[in-house]
Structures are given as structure tokens and as C-alpha cells.
Curated annotation (Swiss-Prot):
Catalyzes the reduction of nitrite to ammonia, consuming six electrons in the process. This is Cytochrome c-552. InterPro entries: Cyt_c552, Cyt_c_NO2Rdtase_formate-dep, Multihaem_cyt_sf. It comes from Shewanella sp. (strain W3-18-1). Keywords: Calcium, Electron transport, Heme, Iron, Metal-binding, Oxidoreductase, Periplasm, Signal, Transport. The lineage of its organism: Bacteria, Pseudomonadati, Pseudomonadota, Gammaproteobacteria, Alteromonadales. One of its GO terms (cellular component) is outer membrane-bounded periplasmic space.
């Protein structure tokens, strides 16, 4: 049920909004968040960036693979997970996903402010205005009226200049941690580092002094094993699994880390080389195409600059690698789904925390490795061998968990196989978890109808004060 807003709370909301408006009038001199400001000065780049809006299709990844609903039980990704679209949709899609809930005010909702961090040049603007302490404080809804410009110019470039930059302080700290400071990097390296501001694994800190801050788990290295050791060393978990009660890790989108492990990364072929090639405009000018997308769509400007093989041949090789990765992915999922249900059965049979601890550690490590491999959307092209290696270790660790579970269940008198319910569709899997999807969708639609227009109106008024 919706809470009625009292006069006191309404006044407080108005005060918060007014303070945001005042802050907007003092926008940072380092970041211009409005992409359209550059549409004349950098016409070709702007128009090609705007073309990312042509990736209109929304692909429901949970519908394609309902196993993931069970693997993310108790976490927002079990509600909604769609394949990524172009940069133009960054703000739209994070607003619309069921994962962000249906907040009714700036202090409501399931997710923190940090969930805006990869979505907009308004993020560096806010960090510059408020500091990281101010930006990261509070709920995701707090940023609704502030973060309205999609991923664009100010995320990767100095204000009004083609010069590349890191616009988020936590990224500079991460690059320093692995001994590759941006300030000392070559232009070629910088072309990938700017992408690493978002296309990476990250987590939200839980320490009192930096609660909610974004951090990359690179202190011990960027391989799946080293990040795993780091997370274990600080006893971090993203959530507790609803079935197995395992302390879980949710991988994000570690394209930078997996790219470094593949043939392109090891030969320093940058993200820009393949995804933002140099092209020629209608008036004969060379420019960097900002329609970030599949290299095969611009084969002559991307792959063909290095490869002598035909497009058809390389597409075939890539599809073959995708099929192998998918096959191993599904094997890992099959083992993990069974492990979660078997762990649930063990708890119900009276298993103790001491008995379950090594089992839950195996489940945690197995799913972390599965997730890191599949969350990197281009891994079959970037690092197929590494993906298969990681998924192989995931299968092994899930099998280790299941062997221990079989022994434990036997001690508890359960010798028959633990039944896995029908999870053949997204809806059936969500029903198994007791998720009221109808209510979640209705709440989201009300949010989109009642709250989003207010956010946009506040943003419009704030930006009208910009010079």
C-alpha cells in the first residue's frame, strides 16, 4: 500500500528538491552532463552516439534461461534481467527495471545511490559538486531528479575536448591498485581504461567510513581467483541465497578483466579499435564512430584492419566459441541449481552451520566463477579459453558441494535424490520462489506514471539554470 505523505514529509521533500536545484545552479566546471551541448561542435561523434538508440529491442535473459532466477534467488536480478542495449538507454533502462523497485520518495526503495554510477555524466558532476561522501549517501531514488543524461561525452572526455579522462575517482584508485595509473598510460591504453569505468566487476563497500561507495576488487589482482580471494579476505557477500543460505557474490560485467586475459587484450588491441573504429563521414572527414556495438557490423573498419580471413569465417568461429561457452555455462547452472535445492533440504533436515560452512563456500565459489564468466557479455569473443576454464572450475566446485551434500543428507536420513521443481520458464521459477510478480509490475507501472514525470520536471528546471 502507498503511504500518505504528511505535511511534514512533503515539506522535507520540497526542501531536498530545492537544495538539489540550488546545487544544479552551481554545476561543476569540469563536467558538462548535457550531451546535446556538443551536437554542433562534434557533429559526427554526436550523431553516431545518438545512433545507439537504434538498439531498441529488449531481450529478457531470464525468459531465455530460467535457471538464473533460481541462482539469484533473494537478489533483485531474480526479478528482472535484460540484455544490455545502447548507451542512449542507460538511464531509461535502469529506471524501468524491476530491480530498482518503485520508490515513492528519495528515501525509499531497495537499492543504493551507487546504482547510478555507470549510467550518466551526471554522476561525475554530482561527485564534483558533493564529493564522494555526498554522492554515495542514500538511496537510488535520491538521484532520480539528478541523473537524467545518458552515458555520453562527459563520462570519457574533458569538458569541451576530445581528450580522454577518468571521470570517477574510484576508477583512478582501482587503476593505481593494479599498477597502471591513468596519468601514465599510453593513448592506446587509455582507450580501454575509459571503458573500464563501467565495463568491470565492482561492489559496494560496507565499511562505516565508505558505506555504499563503489570499489573494484582489484587489490590482489584481476583474475577470477584473485578477486575471489580478495572478497573472501574481507568476508564480503552481496546477499544471502534464499534457498541455500550461501553468502553469495554477484558478478557485474567484467569485460575489462576478461578482455585482458584474451588474445586481443594481450596484444593491446583496445576496446576502441573494435567497437569504435575510425570511419569517414559523408563530407569526407575521419572521425571515431561513437555507435558502440558489434565489430562485425563494421567489419572493414574493425576486424579487417588486422585479419585476413573473411567476415563469414570469423563470424563462424565466434559462433562456435559462443556455443561452447553456452554449453559449459548450462552444465554449471545444472549443478548449481541442484546444489541450492539440496542445501535447502539439508537445512530442513537439521544441518548445522558448522556442517554447512564448507558446502556453502563451494557453492559461493562455484557461482561466483559461473557469474563472472557469463556476466562478461562479449567473453566468447574477448577470451573464450578463459571463459571455458573459469566455467570448468565452476562445474568442479559445484560438484564438490554436491558430493558433500550427498554425504550430509545421508547422515540426516535422506537417501533419495532431492527433487528440483519445474523451473522450465521464468514465471514458473519465480513462482517456486514465491515471488509476486504481478504486484511488482503494478508497483513499477505506478512509479513510472507518478514519479518519473516529477523527476524529469525537476531536472528540466535545474538544467535551465545552467549557463
Amino acid at each position: 500500500m502507498m503511504k500518505k505523505m504528511t505535511g511534514k514529509s512533503f515539506a522535507l521533500s520540497a526542501l531536498v528538491a530545492a537544495s538539489f536545484m540550488a546545487a544544479g545552479a552551481m554545476a561543476s566546471d569540469k563536467t558538462e552532463p548535457r550531451n546535446e551541448v556538443y551536437k554542433d561542435k562534434f557533429k559526427n561523434q554526436y550523431n553516431s552516439w545518438h545512433d545507439t538508440a537504434k538498439s531498441e529491442e529488449l531481450v529478457d535473459a531470464l525468459e531465455q534461461d530460467p535457471n538464473m532466477v533460481i541462482l539469484w534467488a533473494g537478489y533483485p536480478f531474480a526479478k528482472d534481467y535484460k540484455a544490455p542495449r545502447g548507451h542512449m538507454y542507460a538511464v531509461t533502462d535502469v529506471r524501468n527495471t524491476l530491480r530498482t523497485g518503485a520508490p515513492k520518495d528519495a528515501e525509499d526503495g531497495p537499492l543504493p545511490m551507487a546504482c547510478w554510477s555507470c549510467k550518466s555524466p551526471d554522476v561525475p558532476r554530482l561527485i564534483e559538486e558533493q564529493g564522494e561522501d555526498g554522492y554515495f549517501k542514500g538511496k537510488w531514488a535520491k538521484g532520480g531528479p539528478e541523473v537524467t543524461n545518458a552515458i555520453g561525452c562527459g563520462d570519457c572526455h574533458d569538458k569541451g575536448s576530445p581528450k580522454l579522462r577518468i571521470s570517477r575517482p574510484y576508477v583512478d584508485r582501482a587503476l593505481d591498485a593494479i599498477g597502471t595509473p591513468f596519468s601514465k598510460a599510453s593513448k592506446q591504453d587509455k582507450e580501454s581504461m575509459v571503458c573500464a569505468q563501467c565495463h568491470v566487476e565492482y561492489y559496494f563497500e560496507k565499511t562505516e567510513d565508505k558505506k555504499g561507495f563503489v570499489k573494484f576488487p582489484w587489490d590482489m589482482g584481476v583474475t577470477v581467483e584473485k578477486m575471489e580471494v580478495y572478497y573472501d579476505s574481507i568476508q564480503f557477500s552481496d546477499w544471502t541465497h534464499a534457498l541455500s543460505k550461501a553468502p553469495m557474490l554477484k558478478a557485474q560485467h567484467p569485460e575489462y578483466e576478461t578482455w585482458k586475459m584474451g588474445i586481443h587484450g594481450m596484444n593491446n588491441v583496445s576496446c576502441v579499435d573494435c567497437h569504435m573504429p575510425k570511419v569517414t563521414s559523408a563530407d569526407g572527414k575521419k572521425f571515431t564512430d561513437h555507435k558502440v556495438g558489434n565489430p562485425f557490423d563494421r567489419f572493414e573498419e574493425t576486424c579487417a584492419t588486422c585479419h585476413s580471413q573473411t567476415k563469414e569465417f570469423l563470424v563462424g568461429v565466434t559462433n562456435e566459441r559462443k556455443a561452447k561457452v553456452k554449453e559449459m555455462k548450462l552444465k554449471a547452472e545444472e549443478q548449481l541449481v541442484k546444489a541450492h535445492f539440496e542445501a535447502e533440504a539439508a537445512w530442513k533436515a537439521g544441518a548445522t552451520e558448522e556442517e554447512m560452512k564448507p558446502i556453502l563456500t563451494d557453492i559461493r565459489h562455484s557461482q561466483w566463477r559461473w557469474d563472472l564468466a557469463i556476466a562478461s557479455h562479449g567473453v566468447a569473443a574477448h577470451a573464450p579459453d578463459e571463459a571455458l576454464r573459469i566455467l570448468g572450475t565452476s562445474v568442479n566446485k559445484a560438484a564438490d558441494a554436491r558430493v558433500k551434500l550427498a554425504q550430509l543428507l545421508g547422515k540426516k536420513g535422506i537417501t533419495d535424490p532431492v527433487a528440483v521443481p519445474d523451473i522450465s520458464t521464468k514465471a514458473k521459477a519465480q513462482a517456486v520462489l514465491g515471488m509476486d510478480m504481478k504486484q511488482l509490475v503494478e508497483e513499477k507501472e505506478a512509479f513510472k506514471k507518478n514519479i518519473l514525470p516529477k523527476w524529469d520536471e525537476e531536472a528540466k528546471k535545474r538544467e535551465a539554470t545552467y549557463k
